[in-house]
Amino acid sequence: MNVISSRVARRAWLALAVLVLSAPAWAAEGPSGEALQPTSHKAPPAKYVILFIGDGMGLAQRMAADLYMDAMESKLPQAGAFRLVMNRLPAQGLATTFGADAVITESAAAGTALATGRKAVKSVLGVDASKTKAMTNLSELAKANGRKVGVMSTASIDHATPAAFYAHVARRSDYYSIARQLAASKVDFFAGGGLKQPKGKDGRKSDVMKEIEAAGFTVCRTAEDLAKLGPQSGRVLAIHPSLDSEKSVVYEIDRKSEDPSLADLTRKALQCLEGPEGFFLMVEGGKIDWACHANDAATAVRETLALDRAVQEALKFYLRHKDETLIVVTADHETGGLSLGYSATGYKLHLERLAAQKMSLGVLAKKVSDYRKTRKYETARFEELLDLLKDATGLVPQTPEHKAAAAKALADLVEQEKALKNLTGKAREEAEDDFDDAKVEYAQMVAMVLAPAELEAMKRAFDASMKKLLPKPKTTTPDPAKYQPDLSYGGREPFAVEAIRILNHKAGINWGSYAHTGIPVPVSAIGVGEKTFTGLCDNTHVQQKIAAAMGLTTDGK
């Protein structure tokens, strides 16, 4: 893995930690090992601009993904040896995220700020605080200046962040109006999720897809169709072949290997948009936020890594157009109050334990729901979900069989260590590698055992999940003096939530909220105008700096 100098790395991340007002530009290395030097401010306006937005991706989310990669190789982090491309870009800063009416923002207001350079109130997209005046966004500015435009997201393409770059509505939930504005927009390339309400909320309105096709869009729904796209394809709406019930792209942890990744979509967008006109492309990792709302660390890490691989595709493009390109990576807000550290694990992180999780909390919850449909409350048995628990998270109860397997694994380790004394040279090196792997496997085997308190917590969560089979109380108005909302499971499937929570804690991860937080988020950049992105700024300034780097007006008319 290529590294940057420790002195420079300390400076860059100290700037983030203490919120200094300036930070030095430093050289990173690209995927091929080529040094990425700061771009001269004397360069002409950026011809190609790619803005990456990790929805809900705070500093903790980025470092969790970075440290996870180290942990998976049984390595301690090294000074300056950041694993994520976004963490190695030469300009690093922070942006505040508050909205016009709240310290803790939400995605519509934050997306509007990043798209228009103006503050907005909650739940509005592309309009001012009066909810009557449209505010010009970067996509519209870019088109007015002759550039091509692309908008991508792993959320539904009419969700808050992507919609902020082409729509103007007083309510972010007005999906039908947003979809119609997509059809009427001048955006050249859309990709990612589908449309939530193409026939309106009641399903009785005219199908917006017909308007989209009539507007000249080529609509793709398969990986094969996506592969055929190129500069000759004209305007494109590429809908991912695997969508969930919310019309968003399935989580990376649940994605089938044959389905396109966010990096694949980004590579295709760059191929379709590249040309003499230049372009502005916004790429959102929209479901980092969703995973963090669920306090699902393993899924959030994989979503962050998926976004970083998309950034790497943009970096390859940058290396071919160094003096004409600007890449910016930021977030609309942090979600979940993620903490790299938990009281029970003290000063230790065990992020490699997150690798035991094989499905998102949402998929696990669906499997629990499916089980519940086959039982009555009186016949549901905790033991019947233990195999699912193991398959999903690696967590197991302490059984005689597991105890015996752990004892055998420990005995094998002792024998392996003894055998090392009689080996030399290459044979010893190979045996030491095998011994190290065996130690990791043994540690994982022991760590994944449910402690008595954890087992009881899982049983309580199972009971809470199965109680949904019981008739609802007839009372319609709870006594306010007696009613207390149950925040234990965040409104999600209790069995799934508790399983993921226990795994998080075993990894040394904790969460402070099921909602957004007000902490500033990282801003990273490379290319034309990169130095302007260092230090502490506001999210509205991110838009203004991008517009300035592109040579666009920011008058908001």
Provide a role label for each language-model segment.
Residues 1-3, 505-506:
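Compositionally biased, intrinsically disordered low-complexity regions used as flexible
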Residues 2-14:
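Bacterial N-terminal signal peptides that target proteins for export
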Residues 28-33:
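Cleaved targeting-peptide boundary
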Residues 12-24:
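Bacterial N-terminal signal peptides
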Residues 43-48, 57-112, 159-557:
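A post-motif C-terminal structural segment
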Residues 36, 41, 46-64, 114-164, ...:
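Mobile, glycine-rich extracellular loop/lid and propeptide segments
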Residues 19, 26, 60, 92, ...:
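Generic N-terminal helix/loop capping motif
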